């Protein structure tokens, strides 16, 4: 049996749960319970704060978990965890920022003895040490942007996705510390256990199949027999399109293929010009 640690709330919780659901790993949640069953009796779920998950997985409390790369770095666990997957969402950057009217415009302007407010004291300290800087770190649990304007700090080190929040709070970015996204990580000892690693890889395979399918579409159509070669040349598909007989019409063939979502518009237009008809474009839940 394996225990999967998932964020109990926050912006990455919903999309992760949706991917697991689409992969077939349905989770039975009852109220505010911290533990849940899945359709697979060998896979249990634990809900926890995303910031605690790196340590839970590292220490073997959970076998596999979902968390942010920034949180792994904050807990200094990235070297002790097996990185399995980058979900490519929940993207953010941890940056140093200063008030717009500050004389600090780059990392070179930061001086020893300055104060910096952050929710990431460990990561901030290690970063500054690498830069040869010794600042007083003020740990906050939220609303970091206000710190320079109430005399708490000279700078902040905070997460930003687009930079809009910084601008709205009259702050300017002076240095990018690290880029982060949502990750699937595993306990290294669990990955060495044949039974546990098999289950973990099963979860990983399911997630990958959903993520891969998100950028694909199944396109189906009927086409004149004398146009099949031309039509199949514009929809190569995965290993080639599928062509089959239509029993009620000897002059037409049915063609199915999987194509990239960003090529649907152009492909459909080309198919219509070549005589394809009854064209259907369908989302795909999983591709294995």
From Swiss-Prot:
Any Pfam family: HisG_C
SUPFAM superfamilies: GlnB-like (SSF54913), Periplasmic binding protein-like II (SSF53850)
Regulation: Feedback inhibited by histidine.
Location in the cell: Cytoplasm
DNA-binding listed as a keyword: no
Cofactor(s) of this protein: Mg(2+)
UniProt pathway: Amino-acid biosynthesis; L-histidine biosynthesis; L-histidine from 5-phospho-alpha-D-ribose 1-diphosphate: step 1/9
Keywords: Amino-acid biosynthesis, ATP-binding, Cytoplasm, Glycosyltransferase, Histidine biosynthesis, Magnesium, Metal-binding, Nucleotide-binding, Transferase
A GO biological-process term: L-histidine biosynthetic process
EC number assigned by the record: 2.4.2.17
Top-level division of the source organism's lineage: Archaea
GO cellular component, one term: cytoplasm
GO molecular function: ATP binding; ATP phosphoribosyltransferase activity; magnesium ion binding
Reaction equations catalysed: 1-(5-phospho-beta-D-ribosyl)-ATP + diphosphate = 5-phospho-alpha-D-ribose 1-diphosphate + ATP
Family: Belongs to the ATP phosphoribosyltransferase family. Long subfamily.
Functional description taken from the UniProt entry: Catalyzes the condensation of ATP and 5-phosphoribose 1-diphosphate to form N'-(5'-phosphoribosyl)-ATP (PR-ATP). Has a crucial role in the pathway because the rate of histidine biosynthesis seems to be controlled primarily by regulation of HisG enzymatic activity.
Name used for this protein in its record: ATP phosphoribosyltransferase
Organism: Methanococcus maripaludis (strain DSM 14266 / JCM 13030 / NBRC 101832 / S2 / LL)
Gene (name only): hisG
